[in-house]
Amino acid sequence: MAYKIKKVNRGVERRDYRKVSGNLELPNLIEIQTKTFEWFKTKGIDEVLNEFFAMSSNDASASLFLEGWEIKEAKISPSKAKEQSKIYDAPIYVDLQLMFTKTEDISKEFEEIVEKDVKKVLSNWIAEKTDSKNVSLVKNTDNIYFFDVKLKGTEKNDLFQITILEEKEDIIVAEVSVRKWGQVFFGDFPLMTDAGTFVINGSQKVIVSQLVRSPGSYFKTEINNKTGESLYNGDIIPSRGTWLEFETDTKKTAETTNSLFVKIDKSRKTTATSFLKILGLDRDTILNIYDKDKVIVETLKNDNDTGDTYADWAQHVQEIYKKIRQGETATSDGASKYINGLLFDRRKYDLTKAGRFKLQQKLAVKNRLMGRILAEDIVDASGKILVAKNTEISKANIKEVSDALSQDGVMVSSIEYREDIPGSRQIQKVKVYQDNNSKDETFTIVGITPNSKEEHITVVDIVATVSYLLGLEYNIGEYDDIDNLANRRVRTVGELLQNQFRMGLTRIDKNVKEKLSTSDLYKVKVSTIINAKPLTAVIGEFFNLSQLSQFMDQINPLAELTNKRRLTALGPGGLSRDRASLEVRDVHPSHYGRICPIETPEGPNIGLINNLSTYAIVDELGFIRTPYLKVIDGVIQNEHEYLSADEEKEYIISQSNVTKDENGKILDETVVSHYKGDDYIAKVSEVQFIDVSPKQIVSVATSAIPFLENDDANRALMGANMQRQAVPTIVPESPFVGTGIEFEAARDSGVCIVATENGIVKYVDAKQITVESKAGIKTYTLANFERSNNGSSIVQKPIVKVGDSIEAGQIIADGPSVDNGELALGQNVVVAFTTYNGYNFEDAIVMSERVIMEDKFTSVHIDEYVLEVRNTKQGAEEITSEIPNISDNAKKYLDNEGIVAIGTEVKTGDILVGKVTPKGQTQLSPEDKLLHAIFGEKSRSVKDNSLKVPNGGEGIVQSVKRFKAKSAANPDGIDLPADVLEVIKVYIVQKRKIQEGDKMSGRHGNKGIISKVLPVEDMPHLEDGTPVDILLNPQGIPSRMNIGQILEIHLGMAAKKLGVKIATPVFEGVNSNDLDEIMAEAGMENYGKVKLIDGQTGEAIDKPISVGVMYMLKLSHMVDDKLHARSVGPYSLITQQPLGGKAQNGGQRFGEMEVWALEAYGAAHTLREILTIKSDDLKGRTKTYEAIVRSKNIPTPGTPESFNVLSKEIMGLGFDIYLLDNKGNKSQINAYDDDNDLINDESMKHASIDKLTFEDSISLVEIEDLDSFEEVDESEINLSFEEE
């Protein structure tokens, strides 16, 4: 039988049925978080600081230089930060040097100096200027003096260098150069934990990576609807800054030839040649560069030049400036400076390394030569011919031509443009024939030189982009597919944080300029020049408010892992849900091995939120790469290479399920491959690479579904998503039928404790594990009953013993939903596919009581309740058990201080912490004064503000944590907000057994609700007496096509009988032959169908039934969280109708359509009751309550409050509205007499609205009797006031 025994962790073994996967280990699955944050800490911050320093004053006389920077140690540990609701962060300090030079007239008139000694004069002048008494001369030459000056509160002395320019009778004219040093606090920066998360205000957060369009140049074509000819567009898009959009268009004046236009930042279009002219290229240069291309010649005609180069330049600059600034005018020099700033200033225009890489790839000459015939020799700088004229460039010789063109100086010429514009001045030009057949017309391909490095746009880039656009007409160059992953890149945590850091420094830069220009620089300390508040504000806003900063999905380890590996196309600078087209959401060939085609949310975000595939990594430029094994002459090599979507296009890559011998030689003659994004049947000799594993195309969650290959993709999507909602059970159990990825998923999720080095276990208990290694003794602390973001309980259990030898990377303690180092999201249960008296109609699940009694799906949930003790204007609040108007019985669980005892079982409404708040000062009554005199205690005027158990919060008090504010009296306290004296957190734990109404699912998208829990004796059982745990409806399978679950139950039953665990990796695991063999080994017959006996009748069910073991999950949609009833609760302030929703303890909304239903049945009394006393008849509902309590008849309902709201609304329009009774007298709405009943006046018996009258005697509607009621147009009067 074709399997290997795979040791997973601590002696756990699985039969591994994989057939083709190589030996390539999975990369660290959370590398996308940890690696990029490490880059940000070491290089990212450095890049930004070097970009902004030196900072100068407005007149550039004073400058701040960067000397160095460091991130100090974190103030508290991540666990302490969680406990105290703090941020896990560390301070950043930057060392700066301030330099400035001024020319000063130094007076010699110092009273105490009799002989005018220059040294003393200068020394006294410095002392006066700096308010410092510590001025000492270091050294001096002929007329240069160096002084050391110690300012109060600075570590390093200031250095004054005074050069005497001229000495007169009473003054010295000198140049004063000053250097000051100082360390500036740049704020606290959140740090990443080892698990790839941030602790922000006590909660774990994850920064989701963003998938955005890569900077670079993009080309497309469209058909002009009027003329039917092709128009070409080319854009240069930066990461930050101005967009340039080139397009060809037919001007009305010209007959046929297109002209070329450009739009700068979506402004009105202008001719591309006038744009090139303002950059300093003259008419002849432009014609020379493009070899008098017909489109360029036509475009130049539209420029209306006079022939005077400077005048034409000034005119074009001002015209373009007007278009960008929408009609504003400026001098030609001012306009030119503005336009140059937009494009060539590194601070305003950022192409990034990725953008330069894409431009280099797109605009290089060598990348446009494929399939063309050269119209000239390619020669090097000395004139030696490298490639001869008339050579056709094909796949065979493209590498040779590329190598030739990559050499320095090959086919390179220089262009001249404005001196004040930075960047390369060299272009590469190669002539090819426009048409390979006729060879009469040539086209000059103009490109950038192979060694451009600038991270801003250059004139050469613009020139080459225009050339690319012109070549498209002759099929030279390619159009871009913006959905290809070659054109999309990932902004990871590091880059997102670097961008925020840059934004903060931009704000600081403005403040520093102002401060350097206005401060007295002699007295200023370097540490006071920079205020880091703008930076910390930007960072704080990002972590707290950004769309990309999310609460970590902490239901189970898989949810955590997926959250860290998620890619979103939404967020700032990304797409928006409403405008995203189907093409963007769709699966693209370039996703192969990079983005999972299956795991994505259902609903409006489908296709916009994706997940990295299992082997995918993100490179330093942000492009996603996937590994392939090399194939040479049909033999698979043992070395792999990570390829980007761009590089992959050039190779023929085979799928991994080829037949091969033990040496890796492929035995098939032809293999299914992909080439240039399409399927391709290749000869073995053509294949260059092969997939490393069949699971490389799917994500971690998807690859955890066994028999994925037998499931419909829609159901697999649900299966992958629902695994993330599985609640950890008390005793986790790993699946009998796994896929082999369970260990890696658990190890990298961050919930387990993983050994960092080899060693021997010296001590183990429930709180810590001590390991002795070569580096010394290391203690690992275990989490015990900690609350996760989702309210589940985090408990880590040691799985090693004292004396065990462990290796680095081994799991030594399981987390939630982990069993012996393997992911264990659910439980293995015996499942039968049969109906049961209609109880499993519509996917409902029938369950045996045995499952509940054995606590298989019991989970633990922890809720946190927080109480703050504040200092109010009336005085400090107090924690006490002496709460006014509360019985002793209600306080029996409180200790002397008023805090509930740990271990107490509490119900809704019970007091957890007694707290009283002082009311305003009140005058004591004579009785109070008497009591006070007798008992000597103040009868306190306080209000009960205790913390009580909310609706549905009952459980057992697990722990209580108290945090007192730091003060002189309490130096060990923690920093709390102003006015908060103490924070008390009470944790209540609930043990939830599975019950009717809970949602369950398998791993194949087969979900349902438990409809019935049956006693064990009523459940069907096998002939040997084995009771079935769960009954599923067989009708749920055919239409959904998730056949994987059938294979899983048969394999699961076989595994249970054999007492083994099995790994069947996706696309390469157990096939039908293997399954037959395993079932035969386990002694199973009849394709796994068995005779099932009805527990109630004891008779066998007619037909054999499929029974097996399935891995089932309990999902986090539990009936306890959803079921809700209201007896007494809050009302809306305006309409006085009950609020809605469980959180508000609200009522059921009886809306417009429900009213129609009762009207249809003519249930008038019920309807009146619902719309009045059960809703918003204020007095009526009070009277009704009294009547019920006193066993009286329920009074007649009054007028609902919504009618009052309506009448007030009408009054607001300027009308006076009131009720008239039968006799024409005004009457009050909702008038009650003293007998607790409605007024018994005959005329008001029904409190009906007989006439609505307005002061201006316009009668809106008259209701004389019920017959006339039908004539009223319903659209004119609508007295129902509803609140969503």
From Swiss-Prot:
Task: Tell me where the transmembrane regions lie.
Answer: none
Q: Which GO terms describe its molecular function?
A: DNA binding; DNA-directed RNA polymerase activity; ribonucleoside binding
Q: What class of enzyme is it?
A: transferase
Any one Pfam family here would be RNA_pol_Rpb2_2
Transferase is among the record's keywords: yes
InterPro entries named among the record's database cross-references: DNA-dir_RNA_pol_bsu_ext_1_sf (IPR042107), DNA-dir_RNA_pol_bsu_external_1 (IPR019462), DNA-dir_RNA_pol_su2 (IPR015712), DNA-dir_RNAP_su2_dom (IPR007120), DNA-dir_RNAP_su2_hyb_sf (IPR037033), RNA_pol_bsu_bac (IPR010243), RNA_pol_bsu_CS (IPR007121), RNA_pol_bsu_protrusion (IPR007644)
Q: Could you state one GO cellular component term attached to this entry?
A: DNA-directed RNA polymerase complex
Q: Which reaction does it catalyse?
A: RNA(n) + a ribonucleoside 5'-triphosphate = RNA(n+1) + diphosphate
Which keywords has UniProt assigned to this entry? DNA-directed RNA polymerase, Nucleotidyltransferase, Transcription, Transferase
Presence of the UniProt keyword Phosphoprotein in the record: no
The Enzyme Commission number assigned here is: 2.7.7.6
Swiss-Prot/TrEMBL GO biological process terms = DNA-templated transcription
Q: Which domain of life is it from?
A: Bacteria
Q: Which family does it belong to?
A: Belongs to the RNA polymerase beta chain family.
The job of this chain, per UniProt, is described as: DNA-dependent RNA polymerase catalyzes the transcription of DNA into RNA using the four ribonucleoside triphosphates as substrates.
What NCBIfam families does this protein's entry cite? Answer: PRK00405.1, rpoB
Q: How does it assemble?
A: The RNAP catalytic core consists of 2 alpha, 1 beta, 1 beta' and 1 omega subunit. When a sigma factor is associated with the core the holoenzyme is formed, which can initiate transcription.
Name this protein carries in UniProt: DNA-directed RNA polymerase subunit beta
**Organism annotation:** Mesoplasma florum (strain ATCC 33453 / NBRC 100688 / NCTC 11704 / L1) (Acholeplasma florum)
